[in-house]
């Protein structure tokens, strides 16, 4: 089971990333990394199979626990209308497949993954417990160098 000490961000999903950055940044005294646009982010869901979406994401520079803001298309895991609370925690995991499978065995639902089960779910999975409006993003540690570089961009 993942360790709470490995949480590295709290994420929210929004309709307008620039508006959210301005509102939240000014109110909470946060500065931001450059927004990254993922034009072909691969997702897999049990319902739709494998598909691609366009997604934008940004992190607060302040940490070590960062705020992540995501904007994505309607009908996806990044749609605030589907996940009205729009909140998740991001946790580093060494073995994404094992951690995802353990949560599934405990009754959690797989909302989306970055790859198919045959591909060990890629590098991220979004998981929800059976009875709560809460999402955990399991993030493979092999993404850590990319995230660390992103957090330093523009400094």
Model-derived segments and their meaning:
Residues 135, 139-155:
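Acidic/histidine-enriched, glycine/proline-rich intrinsically disordered or flexible terminal extensions
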Residues 64-72:
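Ordered, amphipathic secondary-structure segments that act as subunit-interaction surfaces
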Residues 7-15, 58-65, 79-96:
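Vicinal oxygen chelate
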């Amino acid at each position: 089971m993942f360790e709470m000490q490995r949480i590295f961000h709290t994420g929210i999903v929004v309709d307008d990333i620039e508006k959210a950055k301005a509102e939240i940044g000014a109110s909470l005294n946060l500065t931001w990394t450059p927004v990254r646009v993922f034009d072909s982010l691969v997702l897999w869901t049990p319902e739709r199979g494998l598909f691609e979406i366009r997604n934008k994401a940004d992190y607060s520079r302040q940490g070590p626990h960062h705020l992540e803001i995501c904007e994505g298309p309607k009908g996806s895991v990044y749609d605030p209308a589907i996940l009205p609370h729009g909140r998740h925690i991001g946790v580093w995991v060494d073995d994404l497949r094992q951690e995802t499978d353990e949560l599934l065995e405990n009754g959690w639902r797989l909302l989306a993954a970055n790859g198919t089960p045959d591909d060990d779910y890629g590098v991220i999975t979004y998981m929800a417990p059976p009875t709560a409006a809460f999402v955990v993003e399991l993030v493979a540690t092999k993404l850590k160098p990319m995230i660390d570089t992103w957090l330093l961009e523009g400094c």
